């Protein structure tokens, strides 16, 4: 009889997207049990696009500096063949993603108040990122050599 009581929230209206330390985090509620006061969030983590872009731009500028010292320098190109092309390659080489579930227990609060759940969930996610995934930039160490 228990499964009748617990209802599952399938719509993503309470999905949250935030960035933390260079990671893009997407979290959404997959189960919300009224009776136990527990809410389960599915969490997807990836490297945020602007990190890829920043690293790609650094590589592009470094290449341009090298080119300038050569006899026939090519023009600085920030178009598709430049930064975006490098960005695409970066994503292929360092495509990081992780998914996991976290459970947040309701504390004394208004029953349907979303805020405390989301706050607690974000707190948990941030500490998981701190302890488990480390610094985004470390993933791009020595990347110039392989691109």
What is each PLM-predicted segment?
Residues 21, 48-49:
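Short strand-turn-strand beta-turns centered on an Asx-Gly dipeptide
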């Amino acid at each position: 009889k228990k499964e009748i009581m617990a209802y599952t929230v399938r719509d993503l209206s309470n999905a949250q997207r935030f960035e933390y330390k260079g990671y893009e985090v997407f979290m959404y509620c997959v189960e919300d049990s009224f009776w136990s006061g527990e809410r389960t969030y599915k969490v997807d983590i990836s490297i945020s696009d602007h990190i890829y872009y920043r690293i790609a731009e650094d590589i592009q500028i470094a290449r341009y500096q090298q080119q300038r010292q050569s006899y026939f320098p090519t023009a600085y190109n920030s178009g598709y063949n430049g930064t975006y092309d490098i960005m695409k390659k970066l994503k292929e080489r360092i495509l990081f993603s992780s998914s996991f579930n976290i459970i947040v227990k309701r504390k004394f609060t208004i029953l349907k108040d979303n805020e405390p759940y989301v706050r607690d969930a974000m707190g948990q996610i941030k500490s998981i990122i701190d302890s488990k995934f480390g610094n985004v930039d470390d993933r791009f160490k020595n990347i110039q050599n392989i691109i």
